[in-house]
Swiss-Prot record:
Its EC number is 1.-.-.-. Keywords: Glycoprotein, Heme, Iron, Metal-binding, Monooxygenase, Oxidoreductase, Signal. Pfam families: p450. Cytochrome P450 monooxygenase; part of the core gene cluster that mediates the biosynthesis of trichothecenes, a very large family of chemically related bicyclic sesquiterpene compounds acting as mycotoxins, including T2-toxin. The biosynthesis of trichothecenes begins with the cyclization of farnesyl diphosphate to trichodiene and is catalyzed by the trichodiene synthase TRI5. Trichodiene undergoes a series of oxygenations catalyzed by the cytochrome P450 monooxygenase TRI4. PROSITE patterns: CYTOCHROME_P450. Heme binds at residue 531. It comes from Fusarium sporotrichioides. GO terms for molecular function: heme binding; iron ion binding; monooxygenase activity; oxidoreductase activity, acting on paired donors, with incorporation or reduction of molecular oxygen. Induction: Expression is positively regulated by the trichothecene cluster-specific transcription activator TRI10. The keyword ATP-binding does not apply. Its cofactor is heme. The gene is TRI13. SUPFAM superfamilies: Cytochrome P450 (SSF48264). This is Cytochrome P450 monooxygenase TRI13.
């Protein structure tokens, strides 16, 4: 009996020792993590709560504590450590030139019930390539110019009407912009993805309610504006599809940094509420696909891509063409079709709305930048200014305004909407001279040292051969003294006017030119697995920032409503997104 008890204790002890975290040799780590089955989790929970930080803030602090661009953390029980890298050049090299990393498998567990059968969590294989073929047309410049861009512009113009009314009612008081921006962007992405099949709207009910509110003297007197306090506008009820989409977008909130994120996601998505939400999503997707298929020409007829009015119609045409090429029957209602369609919605909705909200904060808190941007816009769209109207999408699409491009690039750099990229080591490999075993997850920070804060000093000999071979880019870094400042000018260079370049090489007259490669930024990732919607994302930000700054002056908000704390979800959005508006008078500016 005693011997059996001793053997049991010994077995439990050996099991405990086996389960303790095991570090990768030489990479810096937190020694206390090796003494707990939960690794770094307790310290991370305590640190984030005590300092009101996100888990990504805490990770960056660990790198500073170790004074190292690469560390390892134990973020899940019974799992190998996650390696963290904060260096733009090495990240760029891995994303663009090296084949020993691929998409991490972790993201599938977080998103597969939110966005079913989507390419974002597939590894780079034949399945991934099949998915991308299906959606490749919706990111072509022709589709953006004819369908996606105009749809986005029209919905941002509806937002202008909402804010015209709110500015009149609030009379200088701040109000929360989050729902307005998210709603307008959601309407926009649904409009270009589904066209006339999308019957809902978040913005039109607001306009109707605000027009009634604005004309009601009783409401106006009961809610007298107070410039130092936020003005609360009445809520507007949305339909089931809009509510379902918003709920699915919010589902990943709280999972970032969780040691059991995949289990939490699975449990959450199988609760009664989310089963109902998923059914609403799936019913809409199938119904829209059915309607789009019904528009196909009869057998023997030719498809007219010029008549396409939505992404769902474009994808149905693409599936038809792929089926003919592959000598198979088209599968219009596959989970892949549905997943890729809904991915257009969530991807475009969450990233664009979050980045726009950050952009409004930066422009509010940097009045000189806002003023210069408005002047640049008015100087470029002279006809729109003379006619006292907003620029049309057609005018926006062809405009090349260096300062606008610089502002957008700086918003993307500073926002950190996607604060990290995750990859999986496919083979035994190295990063900065450290051994990385096959199967190790690596987190590449996009909003930390070398991008948003000063980088670490790294011996050039520790870099990979491909990184060293690209050494002509090693001076592509931001000045440390203002790297954390919102400064669009960092993206502008000087050029000689084209008519002087050949005629007079000694000419001193110069003009500003946007340089998208001026320094480190990772907002859209890099390489094959970079953001698929990058081209559309730029166009959407160009439209939203232009139209909103054209129509409104963003006034300072009280400090207590202007923090830069973030909420972690699919993206990292600002906790405080308050704005105070004054209408721009084009006749006097």
């Amino acid at each position: 009996m005693f011997l059996s008890l001793c053997l049991m204790v010994l077995a439990l002890y050996l099991l405990y020792k086996w389960a303790l975290p095991k570090p990768i040799s030489s990479i810096p780590y937190n020694p206390p993590a090796l003494q707990s089955l939960f690794g770094d989790i307790p310290a991370m929970i305590q640190g984030t709560k005590a300092n009101n930080q996100t888990h990504m803030d805490w990770i960056i602090q660990q790198m500073k504590n170790h004074e190292s661009p690469i560390i390892q953390l134990f973020l899940s029980p019974l799992q190998r450590p996650t390696v963290i890298l904060a260096d733009f050049r090495e990240t760029q090299d891995i994303m663009l030139r090296r084949k020993d990393f691929d998409r991490s498998t972790n993201i599938r567990g977080l998103l597969e019930d939110v966005i079913p059968d989507h390419h974002i969590y597939e590894q780079t294989n034949s399945v991934f390539r099949t998915h991308r073929k299906l959606v490749q047309d919706v990111m072509l410049p022709s589709f953006i110019q004819k369908v996606a861009g105009p749809a986005f512009h029209s919905n941002i113009m509806r937002l202008v009407r909402v804010w015209d009314l709110k500015a009149q009612i609030a009379d200088g008081s701040p109000f929360l912009a989050t729902q307005d921006i998210q709603g307008a962007v959601l309407d926009a992405v649904y409009s270009f993805a589904f066209g006339s099949y999308y019957k809902s709207s978040t913005t039109l009910p607001k306009i109707e309610k605000l027009e009634k509110w604005n004309g009601n003297a009783e409401n106006s007197s009961r809610n007298a504006p107070q410039s130092d306090k936020p003005f609360d506008f009445p809520d507007v009820a949305f339909d089931d599809l809009i509510n379902a989409t918003i709920d699915l977008a919010k589902a990943p909130q709280g999972l970032q940094g969780s040691p059991i994120a995949k289990l939490q996601a699975k449990v959450t998505m199988n609760m009664p509420h989310f089963r109902r939400v998923r059914k609403i999503r799936d019913d809409f997707l199938r119904g829209s696909l059915k309607s789009a298929v019904s528009k196909l020409p009869s057998e023997g007829g030719k498809s007219d891509s010029q008549a396409v009015t939505s992404a769902v119609e474009q994808m149905v045409l693409r599936e038809t063409a792929l089926a003919q090429t592959e000598n198979r029957s088209p599968n219009y209602f596959s989970t892949m079709m549905q997943g890729e369609l809904f991915g257009l919605i969530l991807g475009g909705f969450d990233t664009t709305s979050t980045t726009t909200l950050w952009g409004l904060k930066f422009l509010t808190d940097n009045a000189s930048v806002q003023k210069r941007l408005r002047q640049a816009l008015q100087s470029s769209f002279t006809k729109a200014k003379a006619e006292n109207r907003s620029p049309t999408f057609q005018e926006l699409a062809v405009a090349r305004i260096p300062y606008l491009e610089a502002v957008i690039e700086e918003i993307l750099r500073c926002a950190g909407a996607t604060p990290a990229l995750q990859r999986l080591a496919k083979v035994d490999t190295q990063i900065l001279g450290y051994h990385i075993p096959k199967g190790t997850d690596v987190l590449f920070l996009t909003h930390g040292p070398s991008v948003w804060t000063p980088g670490f000093e790294i011996d050039e000999s520790r870099r990979s051969q491909t990184c060293q071979a690209a050494g002509e880019k090693k001076d592509q870094c931001w000045e440390s003294h203002d790297i954390s400042k919102f400064k669009p000018e960092r993206w502008l260079g000087q050029k000689l006017p084209s008519n002087n370049r050949e005629k007079d090489t000694d000419a001193t007259e110069t003009a500003e030119e946007f340089d998208g490669l001026a320094g480190p930024t990772l907002a859209f990732g890099l390489g094959t697995r970079g953001c698929f919607g990058r081209r559309l994302g730029y166009q959407q930000l160009k439209t939203s920032i232009t139209i909103l700054i054209w129509n409104f002056e963003l006034l300072p908000c009280p400090q207590e409503l202007s923090s830069y704390r973030t909420i972690e979800g699919l993206t990292s959005m600002p906790e405080h997104s308050y704005i105070s508006l004054a209408k721009v008078d084009l006749t006097t500016t």
